[in-house]
Amino acid sequence: MKKIGIIIVVLALIIGISDFAFAGSNPLKAKEKEVVNSFYAMIPDDHKIDVFKLHEVWQKAMADPAYRKKIYLIDVRSHPEFYAFHIEGTDHFHAGHMYGIPKKIKDPNAEIYVWCRTSHRSRYVAGFLYKYGYKNVYWVGPTTKNGKRYRGGVVGWAQAGFPFVNQFTGKFKIVEYRKHPSKKEMSFNIREFHPY
Protein backbone atom coordinates (compact mmCIF):
# COMPACT_ATOMS: atom_id res chain seq x y z
CA MET A 1 0.00 0.00 0.00
CA LYS A 2 2.89 2.31 0.87
CA LYS A 3 4.51 1.63 -2.53
CA ILE A 4 1.30 2.59 -4.36
CA GLY A 5 1.14 5.89 -2.46
CA ILE A 6 4.76 6.67 -3.34
CA ILE A 7 4.14 5.81 -7.00
CA ILE A 8 1.08 8.10 -7.10
CA VAL A 9 3.04 10.99 -5.56
CA VAL A 10 5.95 10.49 -7.99
CA LEU A 11 3.57 10.36 -10.99
CA ALA A 12 1.80 13.52 -9.81
CA LEU A 13 5.15 15.31 -9.54
CA ILE A 14 6.22 14.16 -13.01
CA ILE A 15 2.93 15.31 -14.54
CA GLY A 16 3.14 18.65 -12.73
CA ILE A 17 6.72 19.25 -13.84
CA SER A 18 5.93 18.29 -17.44
CA ASP A 19 3.03 20.78 -17.49
CA PHE A 20 5.43 23.57 -16.48
CA ALA A 21 7.98 22.43 -19.08
CA PHE A 22 5.41 22.47 -21.89
CA ALA A 23 4.00 25.83 -20.78
CA GLY A 24 7.47 27.36 -20.96
CA SER A 25 8.01 26.19 -24.54
CA ASN A 26 4.65 27.33 -25.92
CA PRO A 27 5.21 27.79 -29.67
CA LEU A 28 2.23 30.13 -29.92
CA LYS A 29 3.74 32.52 -27.38
CA ALA A 30 6.98 32.55 -29.37
CA LYS A 31 5.01 33.20 -32.58
CA GLU A 32 3.12 36.09 -30.94
CA LYS A 33 6.45 37.63 -29.97
CA GLU A 34 7.65 37.22 -33.55
CA VAL A 35 4.50 38.89 -34.91
CA VAL A 36 4.62 41.85 -32.50
CA ASN A 37 8.31 42.33 -33.34
CA SER A 38 7.44 42.41 -37.06
CA PHE A 39 4.93 45.19 -36.35
CA TYR A 40 7.50 47.00 -34.20
CA ALA A 41 10.02 46.82 -37.07
CA MET A 42 7.58 48.72 -39.30
CA ILE A 43 7.78 51.80 -37.04
CA PRO A 44 10.65 54.09 -38.10
CA ASP A 45 13.17 54.62 -35.29
CA ASP A 46 12.54 58.38 -35.24
CA HIS A 47 8.83 57.63 -34.66
CA LYS A 48 9.50 55.57 -31.51
CA ILE A 49 9.14 58.14 -28.76
CA ASP A 50 8.87 58.17 -24.97
CA VAL A 51 6.40 59.77 -22.56
CA PHE A 52 8.58 62.88 -22.24
CA LYS A 53 8.34 63.58 -25.98
CA LEU A 54 4.61 62.81 -25.86
CA HIS A 55 4.29 65.28 -22.98
CA GLU A 56 5.95 68.01 -25.12
CA VAL A 57 3.56 67.29 -28.00
CA TRP A 58 0.59 67.18 -25.60
CA GLN A 59 1.53 70.52 -23.99
CA LYS A 60 1.80 72.15 -27.42
CA ALA A 61 -1.57 70.66 -28.45
CA MET A 62 -3.26 71.86 -25.26
CA ALA A 63 -1.87 75.38 -25.74
CA ASP A 64 -2.56 75.64 -29.48
CA PRO A 65 -6.09 74.59 -30.62
CA ALA A 66 -5.12 74.88 -34.30
CA TYR A 67 -2.26 72.40 -33.79
CA ARG A 68 -4.52 70.12 -31.73
CA LYS A 69 -6.97 69.88 -34.64
CA LYS A 70 -4.17 68.70 -36.96
CA ILE A 71 -2.86 65.83 -34.80
CA TYR A 72 -4.33 62.70 -33.26
CA LEU A 73 -3.41 61.69 -29.71
CA ILE A 74 -4.88 58.20 -29.44
CA ASP A 75 -5.13 56.08 -26.30
CA VAL A 76 -5.78 52.50 -27.47
CA ARG A 77 -6.59 50.94 -24.08
CA SER A 78 -9.97 49.33 -23.42
CA HIS A 79 -13.02 51.45 -22.65
CA PRO A 80 -12.98 50.76 -18.87
CA GLU A 81 -9.26 51.61 -18.71
CA PHE A 82 -9.83 54.89 -20.56
CA TYR A 83 -12.84 55.89 -18.46
CA ALA A 84 -10.94 55.21 -15.22
CA PHE A 85 -8.26 57.75 -16.20
CA HIS A 86 -6.69 59.17 -19.33
CA ILE A 87 -4.54 62.03 -20.57
CA GLU A 88 -6.61 65.19 -20.87
CA GLY A 89 -7.80 66.15 -24.34
CA THR A 90 -6.83 62.87 -25.96
CA ASP A 91 -8.74 60.63 -28.33
CA HIS A 92 -9.73 57.05 -27.62
CA PHE A 93 -9.84 54.13 -30.01
CA HIS A 94 -9.98 50.64 -28.51
CA ALA A 95 -7.08 48.55 -29.90
CA GLY A 96 -9.54 45.83 -30.87
CA HIS A 97 -11.37 48.28 -33.11
CA MET A 98 -8.38 49.76 -34.92
CA TYR A 99 -9.91 48.70 -38.23
CA GLY A 100 -12.18 51.75 -37.83
CA ILE A 101 -9.34 54.27 -37.76
CA PRO A 102 -9.19 54.72 -41.58
CA LYS A 103 -12.88 55.70 -41.50
CA LYS A 104 -12.11 58.51 -39.03
CA ILE A 105 -8.61 59.58 -40.09
CA LYS A 106 -8.59 59.80 -43.87
CA ASP A 107 -5.27 61.62 -44.37
CA PRO A 108 -2.39 59.10 -44.73
CA ASN A 109 0.05 61.86 -43.71
CA ALA A 110 -1.81 62.74 -40.49
CA GLU A 111 0.37 63.06 -37.39
CA ILE A 112 -0.81 60.22 -35.10
CA TYR A 113 0.47 59.33 -31.61
CA VAL A 114 -0.57 55.99 -30.09
CA TRP A 115 -0.11 54.51 -26.62
CA CYS A 116 -1.74 52.03 -24.27
CA ARG A 117 -1.04 50.95 -20.68
CA THR A 118 2.62 50.10 -21.19
CA SER A 119 3.35 49.68 -24.93
CA HIS A 120 2.36 46.21 -26.15
CA ARG A 121 -1.08 46.89 -27.68
CA SER A 122 0.04 50.20 -29.14
CA ARG A 123 2.90 48.43 -30.96
CA TYR A 124 0.32 46.36 -32.80
CA VAL A 125 -1.82 49.39 -33.56
CA ALA A 126 1.14 51.46 -34.81
CA GLY A 127 2.28 48.57 -37.01
CA PHE A 128 -1.20 48.10 -38.44
CA LEU A 129 -1.48 51.82 -39.15
CA TYR A 130 1.75 51.64 -41.15
CA LYS A 131 0.38 48.58 -42.97
CA TYR A 132 -2.80 50.55 -43.72
CA GLY A 133 -0.65 53.21 -45.40
CA TYR A 134 -0.25 55.90 -42.74
CA LYS A 135 3.15 57.57 -42.91
CA ASN A 136 3.42 59.61 -39.72
CA VAL A 137 2.55 57.36 -36.75
CA TYR A 138 4.41 57.75 -33.45
CA TRP A 139 4.57 54.93 -30.90
CA VAL A 140 5.10 55.76 -27.21
CA GLY A 141 7.48 53.22 -25.69
CA PRO A 142 9.79 52.79 -22.70
CA THR A 143 12.91 54.84 -21.96
CA THR A 144 15.58 55.43 -19.35
CA LYS A 145 16.12 58.97 -18.11
CA ASN A 146 18.60 60.00 -15.41
CA GLY A 147 19.14 56.34 -14.58
CA LYS A 148 15.44 55.66 -14.02
CA ARG A 149 13.49 53.24 -16.22
CA TYR A 150 10.13 54.53 -17.48
CA ARG A 151 7.56 52.28 -19.12
CA GLY A 152 5.70 53.38 -22.22
CA GLY A 153 2.06 54.45 -22.24
CA VAL A 154 0.07 55.66 -19.26
CA VAL A 155 2.25 53.76 -16.77
CA GLY A 156 5.29 55.75 -17.94
CA TRP A 157 3.18 58.93 -17.94
CA ALA A 158 2.24 58.23 -14.30
CA GLN A 159 5.86 57.41 -13.38
CA ALA A 160 6.90 60.79 -14.81
CA GLY A 161 4.32 62.55 -12.61
CA PHE A 162 2.22 63.89 -15.48
CA PRO A 163 -1.52 64.52 -14.89
CA PHE A 164 -4.58 62.48 -15.82
CA VAL A 165 -8.29 63.26 -15.89
CA ASN A 166 -11.56 61.40 -15.67
CA GLN A 167 -15.20 62.43 -15.70
CA PHE A 168 -15.59 62.05 -11.94
CA THR A 169 -12.59 63.71 -10.31
CA GLY A 170 -11.16 66.09 -12.87
CA LYS A 171 -7.37 66.41 -13.05
CA PHE A 172 -5.14 64.29 -10.78
CA LYS A 173 -1.76 62.55 -10.59
CA ILE A 174 -1.13 58.92 -9.79
CA VAL A 175 1.50 58.74 -7.05
CA GLU A 176 2.09 55.00 -7.34
CA TYR A 177 0.94 52.74 -10.15
CA ARG A 178 0.58 49.03 -9.42
CA LYS A 179 -0.85 46.52 -11.83
CA HIS A 180 -1.79 44.24 -8.95
CA PRO A 181 -3.24 45.72 -5.74
CA SER A 182 -1.75 44.68 -2.41
CA LYS A 183 -3.37 42.01 -0.23
CA LYS A 184 -4.58 44.74 2.11
CA GLU A 185 -6.24 46.63 -0.76
CA MET A 186 -7.82 43.42 -2.00
CA SER A 187 -9.27 42.83 1.47
CA PHE A 188 -11.44 45.95 1.32
CA ASN A 189 -15.05 45.11 0.64
CA ILE A 190 -16.87 47.80 -1.20
CA ARG A 191 -20.53 47.45 -0.46
CA GLU A 192 -22.77 49.17 -2.91
CA PHE A 193 -26.40 49.75 -2.06
CA HIS A 194 -29.05 50.55 -4.63
CA PRO A 195 -32.35 52.22 -3.81
CA TYR A 196 -34.23 49.94 -6.22
Regions found by a protein language model. Give the residues of each.
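Short hydrophobic beta-strand that contains or immediately precedes a catalytic carboxylate
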Residues: 54, 72-77
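Rhodanese-like catalytic fold shared by cysteine-dependent sulfurtransferases
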Residues: 20-60, 67, 80-111, 120-196
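Bacterial N-terminal signal peptides
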Residues: 8-16
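Short, surface-exposed ligand- or partner-binding patches at beta-edge/loop junctions that are enriched
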Residues: 115-116
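Positively charged n-region of N-terminal signal peptides that target proteins for export
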Residues: 1-4
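Periplasmic peptidoglycan-binding/tethering modules of Gram-negative envelope proteins
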Residues: 65-71
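Short helix-onset patch at the extreme N-terminus, typifying the N->h transition
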Residues: 6-9, 66
